[in-house]
């Protein structure tokens, strides 16, 4: 079965690194996780059609050109909550400076249709004493 492709794109390493770690902790090798931190590379990467299941991008990187891509779930990390240039687009908005756990949980809960059963978190072995 093909792994879902998740692209995290933000020039702010302080946001993208903990989010990347969270995805790796929960889903290990069940997803194809790609990280983009450079604006020029982001534009070049999406200049041709890509097979991406979930895109999480900073609002500075997001443009209406991304609607031409076949991306089932798009999330825009915004600094403020409220209407802005992405409010009329197909992307879900997430406040960038909320907790990483909150950002991650929102992405996962709104993307369950994309990942189906392959999106179950990695279960670590636990020892229980009675």
Regions found by a protein language model. Give the residues of each.
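Flexible, charged surface loops at secondary-structure boundaries
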Residues: 1-2, 45-51, 67-70, 87-88, ...
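Conserved acidic segment of CheY-like receiver
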Residues: 3-14, 19-23, 54-56
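Short acidic, S/G/P-rich loop/turn micro-motifs used as interaction or catalytic elements
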Residues: 12-16, 41, 60-64, 81-83
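Alpha-helical elements of the RecA-like P-loop NTPase motor core of helicases
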Residues: 17, 43-44, 101
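A short, well-structured beta->alpha microelement
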Residues: 24-66
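A short, hydrophobic beta-strand element within the central beta-sheet of small alpha/beta folds
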Residues: 54-57, 67-84
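Receiver (REC) domain switch/output surface
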Residues: 89-90, 96-115
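Walker A (P-loop) phosphate-binding motif
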Residues: 119-130
């Amino acid at each position: 079965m093909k792994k879902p492709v998740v692209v995290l794109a933000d020039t702010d390493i302080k946001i993208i690194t903990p989010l990347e770690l969270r995805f790796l902790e929960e889903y290990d090798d069940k997803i194809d996780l790609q990280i983009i931190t450079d604006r020029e590379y982001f534009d070049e990467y999406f200049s041709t059609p890509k097979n991406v299941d979930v895109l999480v991008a900073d609002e500075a990187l997001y443009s209406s050109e991304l609607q031409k891509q076949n991306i089932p779930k798009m999330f825009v990390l915004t600094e403020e909550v409220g209407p802005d240039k992405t409010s009329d687009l197909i992307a879900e908005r997430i406040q960038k400076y909320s907790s990483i756990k909150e950002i991650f949980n929102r992405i996962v809960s709104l993307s369950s249709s994309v990942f189906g059963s392959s999106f179950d978190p990695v279960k670590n072995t636990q020892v229980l004493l009675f």
